[in-house]
């Protein structure tokens, strides 16, 4: 069976504002299956932004587990992320899931991987997915050389990634916490 490919998810934190955005393309082999998938969401009473890349079903499974961890730990993003990463690494069924998450609240942004890593990005900028490197490079350049807001940086970074990555389209969803 062919693998689902790609997406681009990027997050930018500047001051007390954070933006998280992603494109909407889902690809199976060389076919675009859907152009308007929603891979960025608000969870935990709209206090946490989360974006996912990887297998769509896998990502939804992880998203449900992450939201349960947030509930269990009263919205403590770091603790919920560490607990999810522990489960992901040690549970046989979860280990097979192929996805990555970026989660952000008012004060913290984290990348959560299937290897059990919970990463706090340097400079408040991170990106995942097939177009992640393009988006992250664009976001860093824009953050260092402009006064654009996090939302504007995310939007422009996704535009650049969509121009360069065949698995990323220009149908963007961006959420912010200010």
From Swiss-Prot:
It comes from Burkholderia ambifaria (strain ATCC BAA-244 / DSM 16087 / CCUG 44356 / LMG 19182 / AMMD) (Burkholderia cepacia (strain AMMD)). It catalyses: ATP-dependent cleavage of peptide bonds with broad specificity. Na(+) binds at residues 162, 165, 168. GO terms for molecular function: metal ion binding; threonine-type endopeptidase activity. Allosterically activated by HslU binding. The keyword Metal-binding applies. It is found in: Cytoplasm. The active site is at 7. It comes from the Bacteria. Its EC number is 3.4.25.2. Belongs to the peptidase T1B family. HslV subfamily. Pfam families: Proteasome (PF00227). GO terms for biological process: proteolysis involved in protein catabolic process. InterPro entries: ATP-dep_Prtase_HsIV_su, Ntn_hydrolases_N, Proteasome_sua/b, Proteasome_suB-type. It is an enzyme of class 3 (hydrolase). Its main location: cytoplasm. One of its GO terms (cellular component) is HslUV protease complex. Gene3D superfamilies: Glutamine Phosphoribosylpyrophosphate, subunit 1, domain 1. Protease subunit of a proteasome-like degradation complex believed to be a general protein degrading machinery. This is ATP-dependent protease subunit HslV. Keywords: Allosteric enzyme, Cytoplasm, Hydrolase, Metal-binding, Protease, Sodium, Threonine protease.
């Amino acid at each position: 069976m062919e693998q689902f490919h790609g997406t681009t998810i990027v997050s930018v934190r500047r001051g007390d504002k954070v933006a998280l955005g992603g494109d909407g393309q889902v690809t199976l082999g060389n076919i675009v299956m859907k152009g308007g998938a929603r891979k960025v969401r608000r969870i935990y009473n709209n206090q946490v932004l989360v974006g996912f890349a990887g297998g769509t079903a896998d990502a939804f499974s992880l998203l449900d587990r992450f939201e349960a961890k947030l509930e269990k730990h009263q919205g403590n993003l770091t603790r919920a992320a560490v607990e999810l990463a522990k489960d992901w690494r040690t549970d046989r069924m979860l280990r097979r899931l192929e996805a990555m998450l970026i989660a952000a609240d008012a004060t913290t942004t984290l990348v959560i991987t299937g290897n059990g890593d919970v990463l706090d990005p340097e400079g408040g900028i991170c990106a995942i997915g097939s177009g992640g490197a393009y988006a992250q490079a664009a976001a860093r350049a824009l953050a260092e050389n402009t006064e654009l807001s996090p939302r504007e940086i995310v939007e422009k970074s996704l535009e650049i990634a969509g121009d360069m990555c065949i698995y990323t389209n220009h149908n963007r969803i961006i959420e912010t916490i200010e």
